[in-house]
Amino acid sequence: MTTHQCKDYQELSKVAAEWLIQRIRKNPLSKIGVATGNSPLEMYRNIAKTRNLNTKSLSLFQLDEWVGLSEFQHSCMSYIEKELRIPWEIPSERAYYFSPGLTPLDSKIQAEEAANSMEKKLDKKGPLDILILGMGKNGHLGFIEPDENWPSDECYVSELTPATQNHKMISSENTPPEFGLTLGIKSILEAKEILFIVTGTEKKSIYSEWLKKVVTPKLPASILWKHPRVSLITDL
């Protein structure tokens, strides 16, 4: 694991963008798994403003998604459309989402079908070239939540913890989602390279725990210590 220590979020976003730009230029056909939320947001926007960068041939794969939202605009898919696919000028057929259409997944049964469908897409397309990840306040990775045991290796429907249900992304939902869809451990560990972005003062405590290098399902992001090619970029 390589570590890039940054002084603040602005520097972190710049360093992360430069990291990703180098790899896009090396392989314009890269298959990229993308996280949402505040951690990678400015990195995505920096890349959209980069001149002479061909992003049109990239493929995007969604990392996770809420289940049971009342508004599409609160979804991870909406975020990816707004902040990545459209600004990066990537054709819609090269964006692989859990939901078959621009609508929220409204039930656990529908979400389970979507998980199976995404797993088949990943099996067909091969491992991700790059996977962009952040860490939740409780140490989650995607929607792989802290637990006593590791979950399914494949894409699955996760029961969300209260910490995740309080995420700013869904703060205007009257009822927080009970479930989330997420890529599984297999897709994470099979990714050729991982960009791990850790930022936010509220994550200092869990980041300190993560640095102990104890791999445990109680801190899902600890699984990254088993991956051979992780680039950590942090301002903590």
Question: Where would I find each of the regions flagged by the language model?
Answer:
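N-terminal glycine-/serine-/threonine-rich phosphate-binding loop
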Residues: 1-32, 49, 95, 112
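A glycine- and small-aliphatic-rich helix-loop capping segment at beta-alpha/alpha-beta transitions
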Residues: 46-55, 78, 146-155, 213-215
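Short, conserved loop/helix-junction motifs that constitute active-site signature segments
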Residues: 50-59, 88-90, 187-191, 224-227
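Ligand-binding beta-strand-loop-alpha-helix segment within the catalytic cores
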Residues: 55-132
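Class I SAM-dependent methyltransferase SAM-binding "motif I" and its flanking Rossmann-like core
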Residues: 141-185
